C-alpha cells in the first residue's frame, strides 16, 4: 500500500504492473443498442465496418464528437492502455490502473475514412499536454491512438508528423500522443455510454488548439 499511496499523490505518474489494482474477471454489463442512433452497440455489424480507438481526454465529450461524424455506426467508451482488467471508473480515476479513457469507433470506411477520423481527433483536443487535457489532470486523460491494423498505425504516425508541423507553425509544443497497436479495451459502465446524449448539460472539457490538420 505504500507504493500505491505515493502514486495517488501524483496522478501524472503511471503505475507499474505490480503497483496496479487487480481488477476483476467480469466485464461491465452494457445495453444492446446505441442510445443516439439505435444501432447495435457491440454488434453484430456488417462485414464492411472497421474499428478505431482514440483517447482525447474525458470520454464523454470525445464520444459525442465522434458519434456526430457521418459514417460512424457505433461508439463505445472504455478504458485501455493499462494493466487492470475490467476496472471501474473510480479505479481508473485513482491513477492505479494505467488506463486512459478511450472511445472505440465502429465506422464504414466508404463513408468516412480513417484519415478523416484522425483529422477529427487531432483538431478536437490538445495533444501536447501529456497526462492531462485542459483542467482534467491525470494519466486517464492522456492522448492516445490505438491502432487495429498496421495500415492504421502507419496513417496515425504520418498524421502526427503532419500535425506536429502545423503546431510548430502556431508556436505550440511537442505532441505527447501515444500511437501504438491496440491493446484490450475494457468497456466503461453503462451510465458512461453516450453520456452527453442522456445528460445534455453534462460536463464536456473537450477543446482543441485551433490548429487544423491539412486535408
Curated annotation (Swiss-Prot):
UniProt KW keywords: Oxidoreductase
SUPFAM superfamilies: Peptide methionine sulfoxide reductase
Catalyzed reaction equations: L-methionyl-[protein] + [thioredoxin]-disulfide + H2O = L-methionyl-(S)-S-oxide-[protein] + [thioredoxin]-dithiol; [thioredoxin]-disulfide + L-methionine + H2O = L-methionine (S)-S-oxide + [thioredoxin]-dithiol
GO molecular-function terms, A-Z: L-methionine-(S)-S-oxide reductase activity; peptide-methionine (S)-S-oxide reductase activity
Classification via InterPro entries: Met_Sox_Rdtase_MsrA_dom, Met_Sox_Rdtase_MsrA_sf, MsrA_MetSO_reductase
An example Gene Ontology CC term for this record: cytoplasm
Enzyme class: oxidoreductase
Top-rank lineage group of the source organism: Bacteria
Pfam families given in the database record: PMSR
GO biological process, one term: protein modification process
Catalytic residues in the record: 58
Assigned EC number: 1.8.4.11
Family statement drawn from the similarity comment of this UniProt entry: Belongs to the MsrA Met sulfoxide reductase family.
NCBIfam families with a match to the protein in the record: msrA
Role of this protein: Has an important function as a repair enzyme for proteins that have been inactivated by oxidation. Catalyzes the reversible oxidation-reduction of methionine sulfoxide in proteins to methionine.
Protein name in the entry: Peptide methionine sulfoxide reductase MsrA
Annotated organism of origin: Pseudomonas savastanoi pv. phaseolicola (strain 1448A / Race 6)
Name of the gene encoding the protein in the UniProt record: msrA
